[in-house]
């Protein structure tokens, strides 16, 4: 039987999905070279929307933005890596070299033990992977815990300018071992997020994130709208095409994404 060799295609995962992968790193490298998300997406290759989705996810999960938009807009090459983004790319490539070396040693050992039959090991690795369908994924720090009759209200600071609240059961809070200062991930489905462009509108929803429309992906009935938040993060929601038109949504328009605290799902490491 032919000996099996693992090839490094490294991905760095969080409990809510992949944060960094070979494809995403190649996208970042292409942005650095091309200075344009459109041209970078073609180099990888990725669709224009998939490239922006990847960037939004990375920026939302990282403590600092990896990519920023600069004067010129989404259509004119106004995209560049931050210094933090460049450091992440360099770190990833250095880890990849070490990762390949470790895989070579592992492959040699497994071939000695199993004669190259490692399908069971590969199936185990596959079964342990996890992804989430929630479009909005935010990394944050617990800043407040308030006990209610049957639930907990959890305050999460996303960054210096944005904070959200989640309401979960006492059992869930105990299972997650929540405490002030603990890092958590907040997941919010795009279908749970609503939009308004009226600053004076009084809302009952606890979570209100003001930003600027940067992308509208149009569908036959619903549109997917993405707002850029001041911190470099983003939030995506699904609204009907009619509502999108009535609100006058277009790139550059200021809008507020709001959602109930009960719509927020929390996850933690380990």
From Swiss-Prot:
Record PROSITE patterns = MOP
- Biological function: Involved in the transport of molybdenum into the cell. May have a role in the early intracellular capture or metabolism of molybdenum.
Task: Supply the NCBIfam families for this chain.
Answer: ModE_repress (TIGR00637), Mop (TIGR00638)
Species per Swiss-Prot/TrEMBL record: Azotobacter vinelandii
Please state every residue range assigned to the domain named Mop: 131-197, 202-268
Instruction: Note whether Ribonucleoprotein occurs among the keywords.
Output: no
Per the record, a Pfam family? HTH_1
User: InterPro entries of this UniProt entry?
Assistant: Mo/tungstate-bd_C_term_dom, ModE, ModE-bd_N, Molybdate_resp_trans_reg, Mop_domain, Transp-assoc_OB_typ1, Tscrpt_reg_HTH_LysR, WH-like_DNA-bd_sf
Full protein name: Molybdenum transport protein ModE
Please state which protein family the record places this protein in: Belongs to the ModE family.
GO MF terms held by the record: DNA-binding transcription factor activity; molybdenum ion binding
The processes (GO biological process) annotated in the record are: molybdate ion transport
Keywords from the named record: Molybdenum, Repeat, Transport
This protein's superkingdom? Answer: Bacteria
User: What gene codes for this chain?
Assistant: modE
């Amino acid at each position: 039987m032919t000996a099996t060799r693992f090839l490094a295609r490294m991905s760095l995962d969080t409990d809510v999905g992949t944060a960094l992968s070979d494809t995403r790193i190649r996208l970042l490298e292409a942005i650095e070279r091309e200075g344009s998300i459109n041209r970078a997406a073609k180099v990888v290759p990725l669709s224009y929307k998939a490239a922006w989705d990847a960037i939004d996810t990375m920026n939302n999960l990282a403590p600092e933005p990896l990519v920023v938009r600069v004067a010129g807009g989404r259509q004119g090459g106004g995209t560049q890596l931050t210094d933090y983004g460049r450091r992440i790319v360099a770190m990833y490539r250095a880890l990849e070299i070490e990762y390949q070396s470790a895989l070579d040693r592992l492959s040699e050992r497994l071939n000695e033990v199993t004669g190259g039959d490692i399908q069971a090991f590969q199936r185990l690795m596959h079964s342990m992977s996890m992804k989430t369908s929630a479009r909005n994924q935010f990394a944050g720090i617990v800043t407040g815990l308030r006990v209610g009759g049957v639930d907990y209200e959890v305050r999460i600071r996303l960054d210096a300018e944005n904070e959200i609240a989640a309401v979960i059961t006492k059992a869930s809070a105990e299972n997650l071992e929540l405490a002030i200062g603990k890092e958590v991930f907040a997941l919010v489905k795009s279908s749970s997020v609503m939009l308004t462009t009226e600053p004076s509108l009084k809302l009952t929803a606890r979570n209100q994130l003001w930003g600027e429309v940067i992308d509208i992906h149009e569908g036959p009935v619903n549109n997917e709208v993405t707002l850029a938040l001041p911190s470099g993060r983003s939030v995506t929601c699904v609204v009907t095409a009619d509502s999108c038109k009535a609100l006058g949504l277009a790139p550059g328009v200021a809008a507020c994404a709001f959602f109930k605290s009960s719509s927020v799902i929390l996850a933690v490491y380990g």
